[in-house]
């Protein structure tokens, strides 16, 4: 569980992105589906678009995700540590917990050679 206030799919994000600040959280494959879905959290209203700290948070978060998808586990984990305190401000500590747990699991258990960086949800 990402434990964030609002979680939306790409189709909803496309409808609201001009009115709200969104952070792209993850790419997931829902149980029973083949194609991955990008999921977002709604983090603030239009006025929040001027929040420099929020932009910086998102930049580091997306950097962490690039490291994660590229299997650079140490760099990804370091980025989650940098995100921990600002994540509290935005109600996203659960998201950081999810990524830290995944990174620990993936670097200790390895990943398949064809892993595409998409998390497979095993339950609906």
Where are these regions (language model features)?
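Cytosolic regulatory/linker segments at or just downstream of nucleotide-handling modules
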Residues: 1-75, 80-95, 99-108, 112
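Intrinsically disordered, low-complexity, charge-biased linker/tail regions
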Residues: 111-124
